[in-house]
Amino acid sequence: MGQKVHPNGIRLGITKPWISTWYADKSDYANNLSSDWEVRKFLEKKLKQASVSKIVIERPAKSVRVTIHTARPGVVIGKKGEDVEKLRNEVAKLTGIPAQINIAEIRKPELDAKLVAEGIASQLERRVMFRRAMKRAVQNAMRLGAKGIKVEVSGRLGGAEIARSEWYREGRVPLHTLRADIDYSTAESHTQYGVIGVKVWVFKGEVLDGVVPALEEPKQQPKRKPRGK
């Protein structure tokens, strides 16, 4: 049926890092996992307007370190760092151990799959035509240096009676190439006709960790016979 494997899951440990990096014994593993989920749920709800792409959680020696990747660091930090201090206290209360919060700025939000998907979803909620929203997102990504991008929307597009899927792509998006740096994410748009799903794949180039790609040899041109002979 041509189903696609999750592009991030298949690349874990190859070109993609984990978003939770810690080690725990069997007795603590479930608690840590549940705690991570609670922290992410809380931060995503609290920072809904801050263009948060991902939240990375690390657990060094009886503490927790949370790195928030956002396109609007000023919104997260707040005036004189007040907001980030409140977040730190809330995270420490949720986990029960001392917390540290770091902010990482995303320089090019147009190349971040999560932010692109959320941008399209918010446009659909504002009744922007889905084709226009898709095309604009694709053109912005290609203009800023993406090697390829594909956007797919599914649901009652334009208020149609029957749900369908439509997609738009520019450049190449090689899903089977494991060394390809492909950023993938999804978002939901809650419209008056129902939920519309948005999927975004962004191809940023190939990760060549000391591996030299095999270059194709230029093909020799056939010799032309001189005229008149």
From Swiss-Prot:
- MF-aspect GO terms: mRNA binding; rRNA binding; structural constituent of ribosome
Keywords from UniProt, A to Z, are: Ribonucleoprotein, Ribosomal protein, RNA-binding, rRNA-binding
Quote the cellular component terms of the Gene Ontology held in the record. Answer: cytosolic small ribosomal subunit
Kindly give the Gene3D superfamilies that the UniProt entry links to this protein.
Answer: 3.30.300.20, Ribosomal protein S3, C-terminal domain (3.30.1140.32)
Source organism superkingdom: Bacteria
Query: Among its keywords, does the record have Transmembrane?
Result: no
Checking CDD domains in the record gives: KH-II_30S_S3 (cd02412)
Recorded hits in InterPro entries, A to Z, give: KH_dom, KH_dom-like_a/b, KH_dom_type_2, KH_sf_prok-type, Ribosomal_S3_C_sf, Ribosomal_uS3_bac-typ, Ribosomal_uS3_C, Ribosomal_uS3_CS
Q: SUPFAM superfamilies under this entry?
A: Prokaryotic type KH domain (KH-domain type II), Ribosomal protein S3 C-terminal domain
Q: Which residues form the KH type-2 domain?
A: 39-107
Please cite one Gene Ontology biological process associated with this protein.
translation
Provide the family line: Belongs to the universal ribosomal protein uS3 family.
Q: Please describe what this protein does.
A: Binds the lower part of the 30S subunit head. Binds mRNA in the 70S ribosome, positioning it for translation.
What does the annotation say about its assembly with partners?
Part of the 30S ribosomal subunit. Forms a tight complex with proteins S10 and S14.
Q: What is this protein called?
A: Small ribosomal subunit protein uS3
Gene encoding this chain?
rpsC
